Amino acid sequence: MIQMTLIQIDNYGPWTVTPTPRNEADLQIMQAELYADLQRQFAARQGLVFFTRFDNMLAVTNGMDLEDHRRIQKSIGNRYPITVSMGVGAAETPYDAQRNASRALQSHGGAQSEERKEVLAIDGLVDEGYVQIAHIDINGITETMTDIVPAYDTSFIVNRVQHFLMKKLIKEGALLFFIGGDNFMSPCNGLEPQGLLRIINEIDDEINVALKAGIGKAPTAEKAANLADLALEEIRGGFTYDLVHVMKE
């Protein structure tokens, strides 16, 4: 079982234009600072946050209980001009877990409801479970793209790869998030290494972009992500010729 938390800024759209539209640079700064703040607080509890849409973020939170979430929620409310609500869900796959978390929060009102504030909606918590995360990157992007084509063209290709990965992984109950550079992370409980290898080969055939992936499996998101990083580094370093390499705690 994997546990996912949806973090949603309360009534954010209306707030950004009340009493008049706020400076866009200030909004971008606040969103970036809020994400960094949440990442720091969830990481201190072995969780991992993905910025997703910035006003809606998703976190893998195995090992975190109601009180952990409540403390983070209150901390944000004390220090920011906005508040956040959270929904927590658990399931066998990450997609189902985030769906349960979303439904739990949605049952308490819409994202732009003036009445909904600092809701903590729990659909389910994981007592004993695990987190499986894949760290995926593009082979040789620096030499083949970054150093020879315009920056925006490289960004376009990275976004295209993300689109293809998301379409294929969601069919397996897995999620995918861009984490910078040419890197993606996929919470993928229930996906076998052979299944991810098949997806990587399909993308190579379809859009001529070669990928590789390290998979980590551990009780918490932070540990699983670290193992995924180490597994990917073994591929990069030539310690294995596999395109998908697994490390477990």
UniProtKB/Swiss-Prot annotation:
- Report the Pfam families cross-referenced here: GCH_III
Q: Mind telling me which InterPro entries this protein's record contains?
A: GTP_CycHdrlase_3, Nucleotide_cyclase, Rev_trsase/Diguanyl_cyclase
**Gene3D superfamilies hit by this protein:** 3.30.70.270, Nucleotide cyclase
Q: Which domain of life is it from?
A: Archaea
Keyword GTP-binding listed? The answer is: yes
Which chemical reaction does it catalyze?
GTP + 3 H2O = 2-amino-5-formylamino-6-(5-phospho-D-ribosylamino)pyrimidin-4(3H)-one + 2 phosphate + 2 H(+)
Name the top EC class.
Answer: hydrolase
| Enzyme Commission numbers on file | 3.5.4.29
Provide the GO biological process annotations.
biosynthetic process
- Is Phosphoprotein a UniProt keyword of this protein? no
- Give GO terms: molecular function aspect only: GTP binding; GTP cyclohydrolase IIa activity
Keywords, sorted A to Z:
GTP-binding, Hydrolase, Nucleotide-binding
Family the UniProt entry places it in: Belongs to the archaeal-type GTP cyclohydrolase family.
Q: What does this protein do?
A: Catalyzes the formation of 2-amino-5-formylamino-6-ribofuranosylamino-4(3H)-pyrimidinone ribonucleotide monophosphate and inorganic phosphate from GTP. Also has an independent pyrophosphate phosphohydrolase activity.
> What is the protein name for this chain?
GTP cyclohydrolase III
